[in-house]
Amino acid sequence: MKTFVKIMTLVVLLSLIVGCAPAPAATEAPVAATQAPVAVATEAPVVPAAPVLSEAEQWAKDNGVGPYQPATDDWAAIEAAAIQEGKITIYANSGGIEDLADAWKAKYPDIEWEGADTDGIDTKMAAEQESGNVVGDVWFNSDGHILFGRFVPNQWLWSFVPRDVVIPELTAERPFAVARHSTDVIGYNNKFYPNGCPVTNIWQLTEPVYKGKFFMEDPMSDVSTMAKIATFVQNADEMAQAYQALYGKAWDTDELAKTDASGIVVENAGYLWLKKLAYNGVVVLDDGDMVDAAFAGLELPEGEEPGFGWTGYSTYEATLDGELNMSPCFGMEPVMGIFKTSFLAIANKAPHPNAAKLFIRFALTEEGFDPWNEIGSYPAAEGLPVFEGNLPLAELLPQVWEMDPVFDWNNVSKVRDFWAASLLVAP
């Protein structure tokens, strides 16, 4: 009996143990098949939006000028459109433009001509652009510093160079057609000095012996002349070398190189030369004819030192005709003159854009260059004749400095202030 009880007790305990054990975890049935990958739609390549053109750029594009000029010029279509426009207006800073009128009228009788030597071209054209009342079609002007410094950034002028004309000096940065180069020189009176220019170094013009004997157009009233004298500042290193060669010492040892009580700071040898000119009684006059008469006129007193003048090389032609006694100071160190550039451009929103194209092409032909084919002027376009009496360019260029329109624009105001202050405090 006791044995039976023990057995039953053991059975009950085992039942309790089994009942308290956790049930085995259920396992999930294996997935029968994997899902197919979802296809992702690919986008079409993004096409860049066309650049938004300014109003001026749109006009240039519509009229095929500037960077929108076609690869070829359809001159038959251009001439037909120009005849429909019926007129051309040119603003030029040279009297030679008036000598071109007859040739134009003979070639294009159906296109009315309006072109004259115009003062203040930059002021006039800027006012037209700002007002929106554009009258002038063509800029024919040598004030390159204003062209590149003011008009180009404002999109007031556009380039146009006929595709059949080659002007080697053009670049992407300077794309405007070049009508010609001309030369300003330091001249002397060849009657008073029949054996040649009495000075060989430009610094001699600032010495007391020539006090009040250097004549030039007034830079304060002539923007072109102010840009020209900025060229001496740009080439200060060569001015310093010329000073050293003449005086045997550095330019900054000069008494006038020091900052004086007026506070004028002389930054380089170019500025020093301008200051010394002012202190030596430079004579500024209203125009080039007055300059020529002052030192090379036929009526100057006998035996009196006539001095020197900053004048056009073309003035020498008047000497050959017996009207003046001027010769350039060839061989002067470091230079005897300045090499200038006359640019052609089409006004933004010009009322006669096709006539303007026609004129630029005409101006770059032998017939169009003829009024300026004279001593001191050199064509820029290939194939045009050079005046027979001109000094060959290979001989001229080492004796002159070419004006840099970008430098001039960036520095002309500073040079103007320096020049004005020097004149003001000069004894």
What are these regions (language model features)?
Residues P48-A71, Q399-P427:
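Conserved C-terminal helix/tail region of periplasmic/extracytoplasmic solute-binding proteins
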Residues P51-E57, T72-I83, N93-D110, A318-T319, ...:
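Short, polar/charged alpha-helical segment
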Residues G337-V406:
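Mature extracytoplasmic/periplasmic domains
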